């Protein structure tokens, strides 16, 4: 039986709407985010997940609890968003103004980029690689759900596709579903990306 993992991004927050960088700040879902969480929960209600992991940040954990519908949810720090250090809580336009040189390196996709007092791009990717390896080795043959953040889920796509550059990755919208599968010790394969068909009536936001 193949190992399957379903990643779901958390629902919308006010920071997503206002283009404020969250990173590992613990921002809550807004009203629309809660509604999105209910919709993705309805979408996944019949899926027999063997284990459910979530980032321990509340916007992801609440989304996971909606999907779990009473089943156990395991909060793990490894699923947190990129730690952006001093940039966390700032508007993107403020970052572009105050950190113009650092932004150039960020946009280049270099693994050497490190936000002030934050986590380097290389360490962020390594965190995703280790988590995906752990799933394959410790939960082989299981059906796994992971609720996380847009930046982290994009890192898992890089792991699966063997990419190194951080930028130029497709959007992962609020409560989007992304799936991977692996047979035994084989490589992960992408099954679907950014499936938001349950959100037909919603406006979309893509912030970190």
Where are these regions (language model features)?
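Short active-site segment of divalent metal-dependent hydrolases/proteases
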Residues: 13, 152-153
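Generic beta-sheet signal
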Residues: 5, 142-148
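Loop-to-helix element that buttresses phosphate recognition and phosphoryl-transfer chemistry
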Residues: 5-63, 67, 115-129
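Glycine-rich phosphate-binding loop signature in dinucleotide/nucleotide-binding domains
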Residues: 45-48, 135-142
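Phosphate-coordination/substrate-recognition cap region in phosphate-metabolizing enzymes
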Residues: 38-103, 166
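Short, basic/glycine-rich phosphate-binding loops at helix/coil junctions
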Residues: 17-20, 101-115
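Acidic, His/Gly-rich catalytic cores of divalent-metal-dependent hydrolytic chemistry
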Residues: 191-208
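Domain-level recognition of soluble alpha/beta enzyme cores
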Residues: 163-189
């Amino acid at each position: 039986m193949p190992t399957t993992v379903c990643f779901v991004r958390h629902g919308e927050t006010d920071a997503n709407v206002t283009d404020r960088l969250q990173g590992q700040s613990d921002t809550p879902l807004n009203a629309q985010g809660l509604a999105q969480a209910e919709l993705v929960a309805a979408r996944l209600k019949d899926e027999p997940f063997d284990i459910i992991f979530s980032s321990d940040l509340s916007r992801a954990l609440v989304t996971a609890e909606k999907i779990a519908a009473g089943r156990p949810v395991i909060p793990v720090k490894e699923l947190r968003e990129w730690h952006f250090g001093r940039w966390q809580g700032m508007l993107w336009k403020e970052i572009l103004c105050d950190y113009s040189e650092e932004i150039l390196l960020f946009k280049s996709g270099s693994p050497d980029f490190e936000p002030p007092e934050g986590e380097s791009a290389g360490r962020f990717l390594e965190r995703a690689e280790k988590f995906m390896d752990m799933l394959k080795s410790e939960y082989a043959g299981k059906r796994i759900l992971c609720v996380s953040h847009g930046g982290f889920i994009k890192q898992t796509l890089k792991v699966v596709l063997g990419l190194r550059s951080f930028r130029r990755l497709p959007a992962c919208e609020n409560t989007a579903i992304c799936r991977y599968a692996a047979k035994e010790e084989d490589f992960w394969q992408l099954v679907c990306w950014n499936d938001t068909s349950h959100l037909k009536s919603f406006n979309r936001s893509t912030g970190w």
